[in-house]
């Protein structure tokens, strides 16, 4: 796929990814790979893979899980990605915030790189144990990855992620969230947010959720969100959860209230929540760790192997996530 090879020890690689219209030309992202025992040699036939995705404005694992804990407790290779627009948001200009679109492509390409790299080296691993998690912006990218790769993940854990690109966040409206994605309402502006662009980024989109279910989506989704979160508004997370349930997806939610605050895992009902690593291990571990009552394996081949298009219609056309080459590329087709 790429010239880079899997490192023998914990390390980083740079992989090619999809072009960004705001900066035409080849684009690469940095991928951080963390092995059980910090060594590729420690990977065994039960080892899984987990995307561990940083927050809006962060890099590597900021706002996400501690990879040394995840690799040990869950027996996984942890994969973090400096996806599009990683790093300080206030220091960036010239484009609105991608909000999980090409960011998900970057993360999924990193996952495919490790998946295919293990296969190329003929290293046994458990390809039925594939997960994603992230905090805040990383929770958003986690759920967008699940949307763009509906056959790939065994389970995903969204910790206080953005459920949708609301008008409030897109246009920095007064009141509401403090987030500002810097989109424009002017159809002639390069920063214009199209109707479809908003619809594809809506993770509680009832029509798209029904399509995921119809395609045989079997991923366990866990949403962990503070009931007092005003940054990624709690009401949006609650609505997304209800829409996922209504579509028949396998989803559960932990909406953190004052009664849950233990000073250890849950320290706040706001956006920061508490110890996100332990949330992944303790709550996500219920279905990720072998031997637990809710433990499960995925039955379907991954999108990496299926090499089929995943299509989401919108009011102005359709989005096609093409897996034909075993790595994803997304495009919009106007109607």
Label every PLM stretch briefly:
Residues 1-48:
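N-terminal cap/lid segment of alpha/beta-hydrolase-fold proteins
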Residues 22-29, 99-108, 232-233:
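Phosphate/oxyanion-binding active-site loops and adjacent basic polyanion-contact surfaces
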Residues 28-73, 80-91:
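Short, surface-exposed "cap/lid" segments of acyl-processing enzymes
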Residues 81-85, 161, 258:
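Active-site loop/turn elements of alpha/beta-hydrolase fold enzymes
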Residues 95-122:
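Alpha/beta-hydrolase active-site loop
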Residues 113-175:
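Primarily recognizes the serine-hydrolase "nucleophile elbow" in alpha/beta-hydrolase
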Residues 167-245, 252:
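The feature captures the conserved acid-bearing segment of alpha/beta-hydrolase catalytic domains
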Residues 238-335:
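C-terminal catalytic histidine-bearing segment of alpha/beta-hydrolase fold enzymes
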């Amino acid at each position: 796929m790429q010239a880079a090879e899997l490192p023998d020890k914990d390390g980083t690689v740079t992989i090619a990814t999809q072009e960004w219209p705001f900066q035409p030309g080849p684009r690469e992202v940095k991928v951080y790979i963390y092995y059980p025992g910090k060594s590729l040699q420690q990977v065994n036939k039960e080892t899984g893979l987990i995307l561990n995705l940083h927050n809006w404005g962060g890099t590597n694992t900021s706002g996400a899980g501690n990879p040394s804990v995840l690799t040990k407790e869950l027996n996984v290779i942890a994969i973090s990605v400096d996806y599009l627009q990683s790093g300080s948001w206030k220091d960036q200009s010239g484009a609105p915030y991608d909000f999980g679109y090409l960011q998900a492509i970057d993360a999924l390409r990193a996952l495919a790189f490790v998946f295919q790299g293990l296969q190329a080296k003929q290293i046994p691993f458990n390809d039925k144990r594939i997960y994603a998690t992230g905090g805040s912006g990383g929770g958003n990218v986690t759920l967008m990855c699940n949307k763009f790769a509906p056959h790939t993940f065994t389970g995903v854990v969204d910790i206080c992620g953005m459920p949708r690109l609301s008008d409030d966040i897109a246009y920095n409206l007064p009141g509401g969230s403090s987030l500002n994605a810097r989109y424009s309402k002017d159809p002639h502006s390069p920063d214009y947010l199209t109707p479809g662009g908003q619809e594809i980024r809506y993770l509680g989109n009832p029509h798209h959720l029904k399509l995921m279910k119809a395609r045989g989506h079997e991923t366990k989704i866990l949403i962990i969100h503070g009931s007092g979160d005003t940054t990624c508004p709690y009401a949006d997370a609650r609505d997304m959860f209800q829409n996922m349930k209504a579509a028949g997806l396998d989803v559960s939610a932990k909406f953190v209230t004052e009664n849950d605050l233990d000073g250890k895992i849950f320290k706040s009902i706001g956006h920061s929540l508490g110890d996100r690593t332990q949330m992944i291990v303790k709550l996500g571990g219920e279905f990720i760790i072998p031997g637990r009552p809710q433990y499960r394996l995925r039955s379907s081949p991954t999108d990496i192997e299926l090499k089929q298009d995943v299509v989401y219609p919108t009011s102005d056309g359709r989005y096609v996530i093409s897996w034909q080459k075993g790595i994803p590329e997304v495009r919009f087709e106007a109607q």
